[in-house]
Amino acid sequence: MFNERAINRINQSTANSMYFDIKDALKNGERGQTPFTPAVSILLQMNYRLKMIMAHGGAKYENDRIAELAADFRKRILDLPVEILDSSLSNSVTAVKVKDQKNAYKIFEILEKQYGIWICPNGGDLKEKIFRVGHLGNLTVDDNRRLVEALKKIFNNWN
């Protein structure tokens, strides 16, 4: 991971941080350990997901699938009272601005409590104006459909 020159430099330096001490990490690595207990369950989940991705065609297929999922979601919300913030669209997430004095954070709460659907709330000054919808992971077009149907019900109940 590091060349010999980098390792020599690391060994001659003193870490100013308890959590980012490369020298300590290298010593632990020599004995096959990590400096702190890793998040084992997350590593297991990541390993499982990577195996699924490889079994279904690899990274290119997964990237294309995510792009299609993002496009599908964006198409489905066109007739809702929202605006897609498109200054820099990413396939991984869609930022959605609510219109007509609707409250984005309230939408987040209703989706979670009444529908069991999680979206990403925004914070700060934009808390009540913007929410984000992720497209990464083991999501499907059916998940998009379910989310958009729930959003339609929420907006209809507001009127």
Regions from the PLM with identified roles:
Residues M1-K75:
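Active-site C-terminal subdomain of aminotransferase-like
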Residues F2, V96-D100, H135:
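Short beta-strand-to-loop capping motifs
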Residues H56-R65, D79-S87, N122-G124, N159:
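Flexible, glycine/charged-enriched surface loops at secondary-structure junctions
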Residues A70, S88-T94, G124-R132:
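Small/polar glycine-rich anion-binding or flexible loop at a beta-alpha turn
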Residues V82-Q114:
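Conserved PLP-binding catalytic core of the aspartate aminotransferase-like
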Residues E112-I119, K152-W158:
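A common structural junction motif
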Residues D125, K129-N159:
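PLP-dependent enzyme catalytic core of the Aspartate aminotransferase-like
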